[in-house]
Amino acid sequence: MSEKIHPVPKQVKAQALIDKEKYLKWYEESVENPDKFWGKHGKRIDWFKPYTKVKNTSFTGKVSIKWFEDGQTNVSYNCIDRHLKTNGDQVAIIWEGDNPYIDKKITYNELYEHVCRMANVLKKHGVKKGDRVTIYMPMIPEAAYAMLACARIGAVHSVVFGGFSPEALAGRIVDCESTFVITCDEGVRGGKPVPLKDNTDTAIHIAARQHVNVSKVLVVRRTGGKTGWAPGRDLWYHQEVATVKAECPPVKMKAEDPLFILYTSGSTGKPKGVLHTTGGYLVYASMTHEYVFDYHHGDIYWCTADVGWVTGHSYIVYGPLSNCATTLMFEGVPNFPDQGRFWEVIDKHKVNIFYTAPTAIRSLMGAGDDFVTRSSRSSLRLLGTVGEPINPEAWEWYYNVVGDKRCPVIDTWWQTETGGHMITPLPGAIDLKPGSATVPFFGVKPELVDNEGKVLEGAADGNLCIADSWPGQMRTVYGDHERFIQTYFSTYKGKYFTGDGCRRDEDGYYWITGRVDDVLNVSGHRLGTAEVESALVSHNLVSEAAVVGYPHAIKGQGIYCYVTLMAGHEGTDTLRQELVKHVRAEIGPIASPDKIQFAPGLPKTRSGKIMRRILRKIAEDDFGALGDTSTLADPAVVDDLIANRQNKATA
């Protein structure tokens, strides 16, 4: 664990919005008197009807979370209209295509027109306030237009990552009963086409079998590639927007009206629809974007995430645009045409603030420094990381090589459920320790508790909980409030349980140690082990499967699968490849197994429970101390698993 400290550099402190003194003062007020603090900072967005109530939350009983509840606003208005008078000609979105020679710039005035037209197309086809619209798009500006158009008319968007399979897309369409889908003919990633429209068609057939019928599909033409077409259902975006006006008044939304649903992996296998509402979410996304990235007007800001993840929602679209920023949207991948792409884009567009994932940093670090140093990167002044803890070696490389030892590295810990940053340094206020997410953001009260729920004081290792609500917090699991209570509030009564383990050091800095539940963090993306297990078991030769994570040099966590086959079948390399393909088809490439070990049996207790602790140890090639195995029904199973492990690092 690194204990090296990087103090706040003088030049950073000199221009920062928040210094140490202000951080301490504001933080104290935010936790001692949240009504007063958020009552003041809620005014950073425009309200049609000002709120008089600030915080109305309870983490016990039925669990109810309401912020600014009697206020009325509109997210699209705050991200576009309010900037037009003074900054209409400023660039809102820089789009950098997969092909390095293709890019475009969209001003706030142009963004207004695009969003109003798309909103009018939705209205023309019967989409109303409260209806759910599924967005299955690549990283093109139309994805942002679609989100903002939904927000403008009060429709609830559900963005599904373009790398997910038709089956995963169908499950998300069915869960929120969405009848309108926005997609495009094909996406492009690393020079290769992605069949989004064909995937959508397949997903719609699967959804129809579950009695959810999609009535309209709006299709953006990206490549001009051939796709299936259903006349009467499918609509070309370019034809539709030509038939409507470029004016659409924003609907007055209550602060607690839903803004979006975003599905995230749970430990039970069925993805959870995380529901975020309008007012509190936008206040929090906007405020964290400004202070965590020390955003100054005129900065060029680039977050490399996909809009299919919460990072894309909060820190490509809503946070930056609400702050009248110029936000860069990147369609491509870090290693196409080669591993220098990120750094070339930074030079090309004079990027000042750069936010990416540790998994990308580790893979680019492995490619060598030359790809970085052949670019100037002189425009950079701040680097950020998101998605998983960053190991100190990758942190130092990012700081020394990418940032030339002059850009603070802002390691942000947060979740789909939190809406925005929770534990993070503020660049002008907090000395940095490589590998630590450092200290809580305003209004965030972290607590470490032991397995019995006892709150630990001082330097300690424990389960990370949050003791009180903050405005960006999710409000419920869509359609299943009981699951919301059970998942987040039943383990430690009266506290929000994050599912993460954490260490607090003697300086009060927080170090995230990883998931403590059955959720994997693969390349910064959450995947439930149960999802991967059920995908494996759906193959006709598999009788049983257990999935665990193990340390992976690039992805952070790899996916290790133990598979028991139907009687009479042998495990072969061909079958291994077939199972990898099968999982990719069921969930998407993100869930590709890294290791598959064929096993005659799994270690179970006499009551039939799989002992995952043992499977984790074997996957980590660390089986010297397996702990208590006395409850195993068949101890010989373990010897076989050890002998045939796929991760032999030792003789």
Swiss-Prot record:
<feature type="binding site">
    <location>
        <position position="515"/>
    </location>
    <ligand>
        <name>ATP</name>
    </ligand>
</feature>
<dbReference type="InterPro" id="IPR042099">
    <property type="entry name" value="ANL_N_sf"/>
</dbReference>
<dbReference type="InterPro" id="IPR011904">
    <property type="entry name" value="Ac_CoA_lig"/>
</dbReference>
<feature type="binding site">
    <location>
        <position position="500"/>
    </location>
    <ligand>
        <name>ATP</name>
    </ligand>
</feature>
<dbReference type="Pfam" id="PF13193">
    <property type="entry name" value="AMP-binding_C"/>
</dbReference>
<dbReference type="InterPro" id="IPR032387">
    <property type="entry name" value="ACAS_N"/>
</dbReference>
<dbReference type="InterPro" id="IPR020845">
    <property type="entry name" value="AMP-binding_CS"/>
</dbReference>
<protein>
    <recommendedName>
        <fullName>Acetyl-coenzyme A synthetase</fullName>
        <ecNumber>6.2.1.1</ecNumber>
    </recommendedName>
</protein>
<dbReference type="GO" id="GO:0005829">
    <property type="term" value="C:cytosol"/>
</dbReference>
<dbReference type="InterPro" id="IPR025110">
    <property type="entry name" value="AMP-bd_C"/>
</dbReference>
<comment type="similarity">
    <text>Belongs to the ATP-dependent AMP-binding enzyme family.</text>
</comment>
<dbReference type="GO" id="GO:0005524">
    <property type="term" value="F:ATP binding"/>
</dbReference>
<feature type="binding site">
    <location>
        <position position="537"/>
    </location>
    <ligand>
        <name>Mg(2+)</name>
    </ligand>
</feature>
<feature type="binding site">
    <location>
        <position position="523"/>
    </location>
    <ligand>
        <name>CoA</name>
    </ligand>
</feature>
<dbReference type="GO" id="GO:0016208">
    <property type="term" value="F:AMP binding"/>
</dbReference>
<feature type="modified residue" description="N6-acetyllysine">
    <location>
        <position position="609"/>
    </location>
</feature>
<feature type="binding site">
    <location>
        <position position="335"/>
    </location>
    <ligand>
        <name>CoA</name>
    </ligand>
</feature>
<dbReference type="Pfam" id="PF16177">
    <property type="entry name" value="ACAS_N"/>
</dbReference>
<dbReference type="GO" id="GO:0046872">
    <property type="term" value="F:metal ion binding"/>
</dbReference>
<dbReference type="GO" id="GO:0003987">
    <property type="term" value="F:acetate-CoA ligase activity"/>
</dbReference>
<feature type="binding site">
    <location>
        <position position="539"/>
    </location>
    <ligand>
        <name>Mg(2+)</name>
    </ligand>
</feature>
<dbReference type="GO" id="GO:0019427">
    <property type="term" value="P:acetyl-CoA biosynthetic process from acetate"/>
</dbReference>
<comment type="function">
    <text>Catalyzes the conversion of acetate into acetyl-CoA (AcCoA), an essential intermediate at the junction of anabolic and catabolic pathways. AcsA undergoes a two-step reaction. In the first half reaction, AcsA combines acetate with ATP to form acetyl-adenylate (AcAMP) intermediate. In the second half reaction, it can then transfer the acetyl group from AcAMP to the sulfhydryl group of CoA, forming the product AcCoA.</text>
</comment>
<dbReference type="InterPro" id="IPR045851">
    <property type="entry name" value="AMP-bd_C_sf"/>
</dbReference>
<feature type="binding site">
    <location>
        <position position="526"/>
    </location>
    <ligand>
        <name>ATP</name>
    </ligand>
</feature>
<keyword id="KW-0067">ATP-binding</keyword>
<feature type="binding site">
    <location>
        <begin position="411"/>
        <end position="416"/>
    </location>
    <ligand>
        <name>ATP</name>
    </ligand>
</feature>
<dbReference type="InterPro" id="IPR000873">
    <property type="entry name" value="AMP-dep_synth/lig_dom"/>
</dbReference>
<keyword id="KW-0460">Magnesium</keyword>
<feature type="binding site">
    <location>
        <begin position="189"/>
        <end position="192"/>
    </location>
    <ligand>
        <name>CoA</name>
    </ligand>
</feature>
<keyword id="KW-0547">Nucleotide-binding</keyword>
<feature type="binding site">
    <location>
        <position position="542"/>
    </location>
    <ligand>
        <name>Mg(2+)</name>
    </ligand>
</feature>
<feature type="binding site">
    <location>
        <begin position="387"/>
        <end position="389"/>
    </location>
    <ligand>
        <name>ATP</name>
    </ligand>
</feature>
<keyword id="KW-0007">Acetylation</keyword>
<keyword id="KW-0479">Metal-binding</keyword>
<keyword id="KW-0436">Ligase</keyword>
<feature type="binding site">
    <location>
        <position position="311"/>
    </location>
    <ligand>
        <name>CoA</name>
    </ligand>
</feature>
<dbReference type="Pfam" id="PF00501">
    <property type="entry name" value="AMP-binding"/>
</dbReference>
<feature type="binding site">
    <location>
        <position position="584"/>
    </location>
    <ligand>
        <name>CoA</name>
    </ligand>
</feature>
